[in-house]
């Protein structure tokens, strides 16, 4: 997607992101429904099979953008980046490193939410599994759908004025979501929790919309795929710990406290993103344009 869009890159990626949100809403209900009828193992079998089919289709149908002959020849002459170079680029570029750390914080909170929120609604409000799966996914991803489209447009406009404002927007998005995380973890009124879901989804979209645009602004084009892989791998490796951590907190202090605790992660990450935008972004942005 980034190869096909330059000035509207953030908006293009935001449109792509909406497909993810639609899929989450549908799967949240479908997984609960399948689990309710045939047990939770069946849900894994169904979604695993769909994932395999989807992967095969993507592998067959996705093609790289065709470059002009001169550009293609120059690219072919270059040696392919080694695996370690992707790590080196991310971990020696301050902006990319900060983004990777904060992306990990984003995924940690989202994974914790996706794993435990259906259980929270099921246990605290007496919903059935299908209802808990649907309500925990619908409101937050509906508003994330709207938010990511608005954020994509805003990001492209801000980026044309001052590139560092994209990273600052990511930080403000995380900070704005903090009160809503606390709200959805502490309220005893269902509609108030839904408001928390909505605000959580809408505000986090301002981080997601700029994620790869910011990364590609500070990483040389030949390392884009490697750097993306490093960031995603790191983020989901750390995010995978969230279900375990929240499960331990649930046993010790209750799930409400565990969900509220997630706000601290985004509070710290939001502040770090603002510092990165202020002190590192333009240095890294200008550096690759002189190489």
Locations of the language-model features?
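A late C-terminal transmembrane helix in Major Facilitator Superfamily
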Residues: 216-253
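Extracytoplasmic gate region of multi-pass secondary transporters
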Residues: 94-149, 208, 212
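A membrane-interface helix-boundary motif in multi-pass transporters
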Residues: 36-48, 165-168, 248-266
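Cytoplasmic membrane-interface "Motif A"-like loop-to-helix N-cap segments
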Residues: 156-173
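Helix-loop-helix hairpin linking two adjacent transmembrane segments in secondary transporters
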Residues: 16-64
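Cytoplasmic helix-loop-helix junction between adjacent transmembrane helices
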Residues: 1-21
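Interfacial helix-cap and linker-helix signal at transmembrane-aqueous boundaries
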Residues: 30-38, 121-122, 154-155, 159, ...
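Juxtamembrane intracellular "pre-TM" segments in multi-pass secondary transporters
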Residues: 65-100, 124
């Amino acid at each position: 997607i980034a190869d096909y869009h330059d000035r509207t890159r953030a908006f293009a990626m935001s449109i792509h992101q909406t497909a993810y949100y639609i899929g989450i809403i549908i799967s949240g209900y479908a997984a609960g429904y399948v689990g309710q009828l045939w047990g939770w193992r069946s849900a894994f079998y169904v979604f695993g099979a769909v994932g395999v089919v989807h992967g095969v289709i993507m592998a067959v149908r996705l093609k790289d953008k065709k470059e002009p002959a001169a550009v293609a020849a120059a690219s072919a002459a270059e040696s392919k980046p080694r695996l370690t170079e992707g790590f080196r680029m991310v971990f020696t570029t301050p902006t990319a490193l900060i983004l990777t750390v904060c992306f990990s914080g984003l995924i940690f909170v989202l994974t914790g939410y996706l794993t435990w929120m259906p259980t929270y609604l099921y246990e605290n409000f007496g919903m059935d599994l299908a209802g808990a799966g649907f309500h925990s996914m619908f409101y937050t991803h509906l508003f994330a759908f709207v938010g990511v489209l608005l954020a994509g447009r805003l990001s492209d406009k801000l980026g044309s004025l001052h590139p560092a404002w994209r990273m600052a927007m990511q930080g403000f998005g995380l900070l704005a979501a903090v009160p809503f995380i606390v709200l959805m973890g502490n309220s005893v009124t269902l509609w108030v929790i839904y408001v928390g879901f909505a605000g959580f989804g809408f505000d986090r979209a301002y981080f997601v919309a700029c994620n790869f645009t910011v990364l590609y602004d500070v990483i040389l084009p030949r390392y884009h795929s490697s750097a993306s892989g490093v960031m995603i791998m790191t983020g989901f490796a750390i995010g995978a710990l969230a279900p375990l951590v929240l499960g331990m907190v649930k046993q010790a202090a209750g799930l409400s406290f565990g969900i509220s605790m997630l706000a601290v992660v985004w509070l710290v990450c939001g502040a770090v993103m603002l510092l990165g935008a202020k002190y590192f972004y333009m240095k890294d942005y200008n550096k690759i344009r002189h190489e």
